[in-house]
């Protein structure tokens, strides 16, 4: 029987690849023989990670902006020129801001709406836009996998991170929509899942 978990030579794109989760996942996947594409906005850290990953497998770093579709399209072009395809997308870009968090001495009424909006943009639209740009390659191939990063804070208000938790809850819903849409309209071998890292 074929090894269902063999990822050797699979082209895996990781947004937010220089973050704690992205970097550790990238290292593990490279050790398994996957070809890793790191997309991140921090060039120095990206170049260092690219060199580290290239000692284990084949890797490419590209500067990106997950909120800019034109930049993502340029990233896709570079990935296809280098590797010819995209097998997996890991949407690991995300983060939080103090203004979108309820301070211990404040209430939800004190939230900074601009900060809240930025956190939703980064986490939700930073997942939606890369998915929209990269999924067409998988749709043409009739197979592939997208993994979105959700959070325990999306499931219950464990801490005061209301902006982050709200965005991650939306990602969970978006994941369900995309899973249904892609499987029914393109291929059942095109999967979309979300993981909920613990802390």
Q: Predicted segment positions?
A:
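Catalytic Tyr-X3-Lys loop
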Residues: 95, 109-128, 143, 147, ...
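A short, exposed helix-loop element centered on a Lys and neighboring polar residues
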Residues: 131-132, 176
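Canonical Rossmann dinucleotide-binding motif of NAD(H)/NADP(H)-dependent dehydrogenases/reductases
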Residues: 3-37
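Conserved mid-core segment of classical short-chain dehydrogenase/reductases
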Residues: 73, 95-117, 140, 160-163
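Rossmann-fold cofactor-recognition segment
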Residues: 54-70
């Amino acid at each position: 029987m074929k090894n269902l978990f063999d990822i050797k030579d699979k082209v895996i794109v990781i947004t937010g690849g220089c973050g704690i989760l992205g970097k550790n996942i990238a290292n593990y996947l490279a050790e398994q023989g996957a070809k890793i594409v790191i997309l991140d906005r921090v060039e120095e850290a990206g170049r260092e990670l690219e060199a580290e990953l290239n000692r284990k497998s084949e890797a490419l770093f590209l500067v990106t902006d997950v909120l800019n579709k034109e930049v993502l399209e340029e990233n896709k072009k570079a990935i296809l020129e280098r590797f010819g395809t995209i097998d997996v997308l890991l949407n690991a870009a995300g983060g939080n801001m103090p203004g979108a968090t309820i301070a211990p001495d404040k209430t939800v009424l004190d939230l900074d709406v601009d900060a809240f909006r930025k956190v939703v943009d980064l986490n939700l639209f930073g997942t939606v836009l890369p998915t929209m740009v990269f999924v067409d390659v998988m749709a043409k191939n009739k197979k592939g996998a997208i993994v979105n990063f959700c959070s325990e804070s999306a499931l219950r208000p464990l801490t005061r991170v209301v902006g982050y938790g709200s965005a991650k809850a939306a990602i969970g819903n978006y994941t369900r929509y995309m899973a249904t849409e892609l499987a029914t309209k393109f291929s059942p071998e095109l999967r979309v899942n979300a993981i909920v890292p613990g802390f």
